[in-house]
């Protein structure tokens, strides 16, 4: 790791961010990113905030300032989407988003004049793509990942016997969301500043629910209705973009429409494909090899290089090729089905279904256990002041398989919680 020269406030926040389930390994580049986005004083204040939603009164108590001053600071941070804000039971709350998916992306989801976005893009590229510690922590360390692939619904015939659950459909996420926003694609916008972007649509990044509502109110997303949302999805399909969204069944907060060249999830899937950095869909392409003409269109559009042309073993035409699938790398997105002129590729169910966490709490608990950081989630900065938050986390732990419960108990090292897990699990 490079020599760290960050000042105290940025170092405090870097350590704080690294306690999120997905982590944010300290780095010279991380400190530089933070220094572009905020002052050292702001970094020190943010570092003291809990993971769970909190009120201005709570922040004032933590910072030891008046509530009026706390509100002024919090609103300024929310205006720059370093914090998100929302109303819970009639009372305004704030929450510190993780770096990704979170304030890293938010910083590039519109054109801004208050920060140097070109410099920021270069720093993101170095920290995320070149150094690799962050991307490995985000996409590789553990079985449960941040995001998952949604199958292209147009590749599943309506008269097919295949069953697609509602939580596997982007269309259902759009149709059922209370709020939906669309913003600039963080990945392609970043690459644009580096002179490496492709010509895929830029304004097509989707957010939902309370995240979308906060981004919309602060000018980082444009509110769209269900009809326009479905039109944007159709546009993404037309451009052979992959739908990569939050790895939860309920209350999905984001869906990115990813190209293979710019988008970090797809880059990670190519680099670390055998480690399953992105959860796949529950479908897999199947090729009728006798009908394959070897045109290579599926190879061209596959974002993770899971498709290739191999010898057709045709003695009459020894140079003849056919498409082949690397099942260990395939995300099950379906873009290959859409472009096949011979219509010899179809989507079929995977032999083993992929388990999707129920909600964000379930996902966070699973990620924390697998990455050895559950104690950070539970004994976070004053997080236990909320019995509701504690109950949600313990409830998710108690629903885990026995092996995961044992791992959780070992990590927490709390007599009370350990005994509770043992009692409920019969261990």
Role assignments for model-derived ranges:
Residues 1-31:
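Long, low-complexity, charged/polar intrinsically disordered regions in eukaryotic proteins
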Residues 52-63:
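Short acidic, hydrophobic short linear motifs in intrinsically disordered regions
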Residues 63-79:
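Short amphipathic alpha-helical interaction segments
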Residues 78-89, 307-308, 345-346:
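A short, conserved structural fragment
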Residues 91-131:
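Short, amphipathic alpha-helical interaction segments positioned at domain boundaries
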Residues 96, 242-250, 254, 272-301, ...:
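Ferredoxin-like iron-sulfur electron-transfer modules
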Residues 129-284, 316:
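Catalytic cores of enzyme domains
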Residues 318-427:
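Flanking helices and flexible, charged tails adjoining ferredoxin-like Fe-S electron-transfer domains
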């Amino acid at each position: 790791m490079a020599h760290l020269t960050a000042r105290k406030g940025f170092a405090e926040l870097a350590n704080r961010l690294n306690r999120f389930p997905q982590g944010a390994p300290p780095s010279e580049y991380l400190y530089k990113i933070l220094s572009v986005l905020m002052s050292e004083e702001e970094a020190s204040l943010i570092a003291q905030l809990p993971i769970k939603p909190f009120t201005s009164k709570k922040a004032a108590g933590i910072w030891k300032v008046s509530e009026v001053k706390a509100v002024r600071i919090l609103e300024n941070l929310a205006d720059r989407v370093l914090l998100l804000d929302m109303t819970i039971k009639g009372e305004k709350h704030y929450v510190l988003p993780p770096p990704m998916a979170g304030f890293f992306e938010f910083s590039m989801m519109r054109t801004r004049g208050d920060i140097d976005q070109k410099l920021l893009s270069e720093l993101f590229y170095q920290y995320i793509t070149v150094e690799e510690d962050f991307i490995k922590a985000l996409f590789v360390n553990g079985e449960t990942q941040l995001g998952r692939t949604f199958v292209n619904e147009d590749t599943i015939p309506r008269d097919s016997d295949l069953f697609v659950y509602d939580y596997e459909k982007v269309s259902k996420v759009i149709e059922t969301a209370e709020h939906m926003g669309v913003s600039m694609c963080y990945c392609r916008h970043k690459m644009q500043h580096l002179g490496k972007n492709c010509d895929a649509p830029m304004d097509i990044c989707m957010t939902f629910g309370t995240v979308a509502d906060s981004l919309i109110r602060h000018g980082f997303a444009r509110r769209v209705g269900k009809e326009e949302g479905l039109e944007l999805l159709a546009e993404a399909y037309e451009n052979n973009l992959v739908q990569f969204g939050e790895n939860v069944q309920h209350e999905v907060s984001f869906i990115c429409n990813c190209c293979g060249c710019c988008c970090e999830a797809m880059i990670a899937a190519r680099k670390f494909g055998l480690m399953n950095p992105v959860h796949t869909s529950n479908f897999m392409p199947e090729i009728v090899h006798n009908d394959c003409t070897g045109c290579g269109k599926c190879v061209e559009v596959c974002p993770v290089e899971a498709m290739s042309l191999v010898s057709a073993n045709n003695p009459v035409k020894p140079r003849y090729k056919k498409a082949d699938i690397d099942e260990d790398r395939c995300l099950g997105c379906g873009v290959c089905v859409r472009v096949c002129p011979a219509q010899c590729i179809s989507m079929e169910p995977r032999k083993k279904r992929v388990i999707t966490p129920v909600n964000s709490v379930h996902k966070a608990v699973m990620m924390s256990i697998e990455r050895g950081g559950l104690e950070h989630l539970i004994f976070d900065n004053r997080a236990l002041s909320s019995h509701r938050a504690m109950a949600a986390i313990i409830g998710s732990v108690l629903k885990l398989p026995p092996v995961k419960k044992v791992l959780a108990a070992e990590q927490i090292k709390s007599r009370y919680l350990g005994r509770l897990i043992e009692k409920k699990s019969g261990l």
